């Protein structure tokens, strides 16, 4: 319901995809109540529907007495504020052509008269998408907002619906009704809503992913094609959302609305969701990626200054239970690395990794990290306990990388802790950048979704957005650990 209101205020058409009995027509009846003296028109299309049934019958008296071809439009689409057309794809070509003009220009040619349509939104519905190669592409492209209308999924909500009485008309207070004057005034204010650079960056991220997706094998380019006209309308929809939420600029909480604007086939919806969600954290993700590469580069450059392969010295490192190095700052508790495996682990400067496993050892009350290599004990290579986790290992001077995160081995007291001073500086700079720039900016983004409400985000939109934020927060924490551990390797 909220999205249809948003579409109406933005002057856009909306398509509802879903099976019968999901209250699609009720949406149109309710939406007209938002407008003062609002009129609605609804019709169930069939292959035999004629323009007379949609736009009004031809006036026999005018045709007979004045030789004028003119329709009686009162009570039909040309006089309605909200239009609902069910089974839209069954419309005949003549109806489709008239609808295109009505949607695009908000006019209807009635004989020699050009009628300005009061239509705020055309809501179309069907349980299927338009068939390919039947000339429906132009009409399909005019529906900016595309929503999937499913049956109630929650059992609690289902029985709540069952127990409720029949839905009655809602009386909207007169001071809340949208008048024509107010609607026209809003359009001017909506156009002045600002589009910040961070919004442009998020959309650029989506556009880049759309292009990459369309280049994949066995993918129809048109499945991910979005015209410039459609992008222009998307931004106008976001501006409308910001305006109705009382803002003077679009913010990141408006971006998830694009999920309902960018898919062309139902099969592409999951990919579109991923693209839109990833754009929410694109700034933080890029910063994290750059900082990670900076640390890796600094470690490699300093490592190249040392001769021979990466190694560790027992004289500098603390050995536990005769056979293990203690891994510092492992997030899940005490962690030991089997020292004999170290020489079989790939050096991180090669860009390669060695397979390994992490598993709990109840006797040692610690997590054990082992490398898997030819000649390793059979028991470790085939360990399949539920608590065994497969990891990727790389060695570095004085420590080990586990799934890309460096961990230092515990050193004996008095051991040299400044092997690579410039790396320490790089790690310190990274930590400062994370704490002073990346983290605060991310917290502001997170606050938008957790502590401010966007009227038009569905529960699913919000859930997907928060999931993306959680993934980014996890990457941010991993980056902190990587930077902190890089310091401990020194």
Model-derived features: where do they sit?
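Conserved C-terminal "switch" segment of AAA+ ATPases
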Residues: 1, 147-219, 247-248
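Conserved RecA-like P-loop NTPase ATPase core
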Residues: 4, 16, 54, 86, ...
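C-terminal helical "lid" subdomain and adjoining coupling/linker elements of P-loop NTPases
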Residues: 194, 209-283
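Pre-Walker A adenine-sensing motif
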Residues: 1-7, 71-72
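Walker A/P-loop
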Residues: 5-47
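Canonical AAA+ ATPase core
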Residues: 38, 61-66, 82-95, 101-177
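Short glycine-rich substrate-engagement loop in P-loop NTPases that contacts/grips substrate
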Residues: 47-78
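Terminal-proximal interaction/regulatory segments of ATP-powered molecular machines
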Residues: 268-490
């Amino acid at each position: 319901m909220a999205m249809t209101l948003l579409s109406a205020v933005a002057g856009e058409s909306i398509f509802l995809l879903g099976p019968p009995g999901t209250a699609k027509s009720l949406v149109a009846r309710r939406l007209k109540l938002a407008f003062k003296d609002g009129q609605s028109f609804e019709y169930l299309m069939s292959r035999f529907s004629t323009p007379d049934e949609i736009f009004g019958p031809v006036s026999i008296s005018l045709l007979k007495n004045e030789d004028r071809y003119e329709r009686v439009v009162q009570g039909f689409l040309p006089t309605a504020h909200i239009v609902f057309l069910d089974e839209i794809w069954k419309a005949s070509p003549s109806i489709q052509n008239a609808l295109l003009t009505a949607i695009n220009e908000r006019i209807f040619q009635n004989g020699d008269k050009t009628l300005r349509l009061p239509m705020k939104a055309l809501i179309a519905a069907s349980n299927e998408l338009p068939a390919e190669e039947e000339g429906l592409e132009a009409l399909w492209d005019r529906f900016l907002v595309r929503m999937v209308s499913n049956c109630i999924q929650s059992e609690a909500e289902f029985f709540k619906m069952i127990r409720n009485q029949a839905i009655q008309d809602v009386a909207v207070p007169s001071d809340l009704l949208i008048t024509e004057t107010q609607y026209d005034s809003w359009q001017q204010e909506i156009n002045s809503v600002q589009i910040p650079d961070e919004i442009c960056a998020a959309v650029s991220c989506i556009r880049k992913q759309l292009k990459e997706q369309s280049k994949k094998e066995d993918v129809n380019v048109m499945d991910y094609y979005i015209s410039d006209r459609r992008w222009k309308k998307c931004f106008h929809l976001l501006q409308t959302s910001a305006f109705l939420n009382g803002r003077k600029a679009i913010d990141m909480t408006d971006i998830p609305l694009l999920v309902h604007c960018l898919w062309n086939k139902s099969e592409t919806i999951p990919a579109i969701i991923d693209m839109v969600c990833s754009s929410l954290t694109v700034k933080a993700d890029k910063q994290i990626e750059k900082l990670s590469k900076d640390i890796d580069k600094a470690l490699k450059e300093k490592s190249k200054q040392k001769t021979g392969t990466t190694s560790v010295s027992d004289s500098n490192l603390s050995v536990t239970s005769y056979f293990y190095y203690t891994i510092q700052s492992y997030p899940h508790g005490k962690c030991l690395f089997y020292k004999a495996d170290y020489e079989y682990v790939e050096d991180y400067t090669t860009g390669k990794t060695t397979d390994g496993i992490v598993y709990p050892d109840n006797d040692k009350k610690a997590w054990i990290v082992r490398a898997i290599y030819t000649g390793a004990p059979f028991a470790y290579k085939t360990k399949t306990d539920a608590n065994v986790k497969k990891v990727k290992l790389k060695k570095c001077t004085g420590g080990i990388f586990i799934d890309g995160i460096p961990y230092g081995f515990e050193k004996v007291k008095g051991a040299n802790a400044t092997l690579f001073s410039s790396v320490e500086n790089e790690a310190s700079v990274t930590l400062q950048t994370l704490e002073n720039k990346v983290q605060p900016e991310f917290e502001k983004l997170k606050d938008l979704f957790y502590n401010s409400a966007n009227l038009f985000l569905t529960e699913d939109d919000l859930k997907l957005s928060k999931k993306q934020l959680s993934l980014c927060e996890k990457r941010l924490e991993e980056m902190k650990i990587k930077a902190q551990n890089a310091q401990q390797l020194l």
